[in-house]
Amino acid sequence: MSSTLSDVFRSHPIHIPLSNPPDFKSLPDSYTWTPKDDLLFSASASDETLPLIDLSDIHVATLVGHACTTWGAFQITNHGVPSRLLDDIEFLTGSLFRLPVQRKLKAARSENGVSGYGVARIASFFNKKMWSEGFTVIGSPLHDFRKLWPSHHLKYCEIIEEYEEHMQKLAAKLMWFALGSLGVEEKDIQWAGPNSDFQGTQAVIQLNHYPKCPEPDRAMGLAAHTDSTLMTILYQNNTAGLQVFRDDVGWVTAPPVPGSLVVNVGDLLHILTNGIFPSVLHRARVNHVRSRFSMAYLWGPPSDIMISPLPKLVDPLQSPLYPSLTWKQYLATKATHFNQSLSIIRN
C-alpha cells in the first residue's frame, strides 16, 4: 500500500513547540542571529539578479535548463496562473495570519501532525528562533480551515484546491522544460504517468508570514536551507525577502516582479539529474517597514517511487552520484542530517 504524503511526514516528525509570539516592537535575544548561529548569516550580498524567464519565449526549454544548471532558481512570467487566483491566495494568506493568535492556535499543528499552524520544520536545527509563522496544507484543508473560519471556510478551501490544480500543471510543464533541455524524453520517466503529466505526484502548500521587524539585520525570517522536493514554486507579495545563495557571488535577492513566480530546484531533482541541477540554498530575510507573505508549492514525486539519477544523465564510465531512494527515505535522512543530507547519501 502506498504512503500518502501526510504519512511520509508523520513518520518523520520534527516537532517544535509553539512559544508565545515575540513582542513585535523589540527583538528578544532568542530571535537575535549571529554567524555563530548560521555560518552564512553574514555572507556577502550581491547585486546579481535571478534569471527572469517568459514562458511564452520560443526558447523557453533552453532558458529554463540554463537557469537550472547555473542558478538552481529563476523567476517566471506568462506562466498561465490567473492573476485573480494569485490575488486570492495572497488574500487568504493575509486573512489567516491576521487572525487573533488564539484563533490560529485552534488549528495548531499537533505533535505528530503535519498540517496546520506552526513554526518551520527546519527550526529544530537552529538555536535561534525565526521571525516568522507558517501554515502547512497537505491534502484538504477543510478540517483546519473550519476551526479558523467557522462560517466561511468553504470559499478558502476552494481557493486552495484551485491553486493546487494550477500549480501541479505548471510544475509538470516546468519539469519537462528543464529535463527536455538535457535530452530527457517522456519514456525515460515511467512514473510521469501514461499521459506524462505527473498526475501521481504529491505536494505541500506552505503559507508564510514574516512580520515587520524592529532590527531586521539581526533577525532571520527563515534560515538557509534546501528543499526536499523536486521543485518549489513560490509566489511572494510585493515585498522582497527571498534570497538564494551562489558560491561565486553570495546571497542574491529575488525581487518581487508583479505577477511573477519564483522557481527553485529541490534535492530530488538534483538527484534525478545526477547533480547537473544544483539544489539551491535559500533563505528569507525580514524588514522593518512592512510584513511579507509568501506561498510555496512544494512539489515531489509519488512518495513510494524510487528516485535515482536518470541513466541518460550518467557517464557510462562512472557510477551514479546518488543511490536509488524514495521521497520517504530521503525525508528520513533530511530529518536527521538537514543540509548535509545530499553529502551523506552521495555514492
Curated annotation (Swiss-Prot):
Q: Which reaction does it catalyse?
A: gibberellin A20 + 2-oxoglutarate + O2 = gibberellin A1 + succinate + CO2
Q: Which terms under GO biological process does the entry name?
A: gibberellin biosynthetic process; response to red light; response to red or far red light
Q: What induces it?
A: Not under feedback regulation. Regulated by phytochrome. Induced by red light pulse and reaches its maximum level after 12 hours. Transcriptionally regulated by LEAFY COTYLEDON2 and FUSCA3. Not regulated by cold treatment or auxin. Up-regulated by paclobutrazol.
> Which Pfam family, an example, fits this chain?
2OG-FeII_Oxy
**Which residues of this UniProt protein bind 2-oxoglutarate?**
R292
What molecular functions are annotated in GO for this chain?
A: gibberellin 3-beta-dioxygenase activity; metal ion binding
Top enzyme class = oxidoreductase
Tell me which residues make up the Fe2OG dioxygenase domain. Answer: 197-301
Q: Where is the active site?
A: R292
Kindly tell me the pathway this chain contributes to. Plant hormone biosynthesis; gibberellin biosynthesis
Keyword check for Signal: no
Tissue specificity field = Highly expressed in seedlings but also expressed in roots, leaves, stems, flowers, siliques and seeds. Detected predominantly in the hypocotyl and roots of young seedlings and in the petioles and vasculature of leaves. Not expressed in the shoot apical meristem, but found in the elongation zone, the quiescent center cells and the columella cells of the root tips. Found in the cortex and the endodermis of the embryo axis in germinating seeds.
Q: Does the keyword Zinc apply?
A: no
Enzyme Commission no? 1.14.11.15
Q: Which Gene3D superfamilies match?
A: B-lactam Antibiotic, Isopenicillin N Synthase, Chain (2.60.120.330)
- Effect of inactivating the gene: No visible phenotype; probably due to redundancy with GA3OX1. Ga3ox1 and ga3ox2 double mutant has a severe defect in seed germination and root growth, and a dwarf phenotype.
What are the required cofactors? L-ascorbate; Fe(2+)
Q: Give the record's keywords alphabetically.
A: Dioxygenase, Iron, Metal-binding, Oxidoreductase
Q: Please report which protein family the annotation says this sequence is part of.
A: Belongs to the iron/ascorbate-dependent oxidoreductase family. GA3OX subfamily.
Role according to the record: Converts the inactive gibberellin (GA) precursors GA9 and GA20 in the bioactives gibberellins GA4 and GA1. Involved in the production of bioactive GA for vegetative growth and development.
The name on file for this protein is: Gibberellin 3-beta-dioxygenase 2
Q: Which organism is it from?
A: Arabidopsis thaliana (Mouse-ear cress)
Query: Which gene name belongs to this protein?
Result: GA3OX2
